[in-house]
């Protein structure tokens, strides 16, 4: 979700960068061919007592520069979203809010960076850092890296990473949020991002369409230790019950996946951006809880400005390679499909039937500037496994393609993170039956 920016307190970095980031995101998604839809959002008042809070959010948003907001009556709200609860008394309409494919958004920008000379080291954990003359030395697997500046964007670990060089003056509170993803049969239940009035735990449980046509519902907010992304029955029940206050008719029997993420909440209600006098050249970008995704491009501008002030950035590259085209086979016309298959026959072989993802799209994901090398890596780049069966049909074929294209032993192929091997052993080794 790309939030409009009415929730952060006026005058905070979060408020300023949220509004700026959403405007930049629209430009970036158009330039880099990222799935994006400016559908707008509604914050509901579900009883008369919540109506003053809508006015408060409207005043916040006005101070923050959020465009086009309007407080709607009950009748206006239900006219826009007829499946909402009959208890709705009104809503705050924010037309600048949008939905985006978050993995594609991040990967597209990373691909452009790599294309223009950035060296990307994956699964490369920083285990120590020390200040040296003119910069820092980072300890990583297999050696060290010396650099003039460090940008600490380590998410839920940002305070611990900062503490490698100086005691951190902020504390990250890892907070888990659980979600339901529902089948496309539920994708038209609402047309806009639906919020309830926010509380001390955050923006609350939302109901929203996705750019792929599904319905997403969540999250809750539960402090956890580290990166605990497990789902709980109590957490999912809370999400379900709370969401039905907004949209009672959601059919959770159409859920195709539940999942959780951990956001980097802070002990202060703002982003941490910048250097400390005790650690010059060490730039923290920390506490990027919601609206972190919304603000991300504007946060990057802040980091660039700091690097420019330190004189570590040269002139803009004359041969900078911008732009991106992502082929989505199912969205092509019949003529375009025929021409593409004639040129590249792999696009004529459908691997994921739920989402109509072709072998050609998977091969593109395996050989991009930031190539996939896991089942979920392919899923996030190409969409294979995103559908109703969640990879039950196409998963084995995707594994075969990874093995064939990247030369990885099938037993070494991961679902996602280290230790998530899909296969544990061979059967009928040497052609002899175990039976």
Task: Annotate each language-model stretch with its function.
Residues 92-149:
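Helical element adjacent to the flavin cofactor pocket in flavoenzyme catalytic cores
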Residues 352-354, 389, 394:
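Short cysteine clusters
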Residues 108, 198, 202, 211-212, ...:
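C-terminal catalytic lobe of FAD-dependent flavoproteins
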Residues 407-434:
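Low-complexity, small/polar and acidic-rich linker and loop segments
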Residues 358-369, 392-410:
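Iron-sulfur (Fe-S) cluster-binding segments and ferredoxin-like electron-carrier domains
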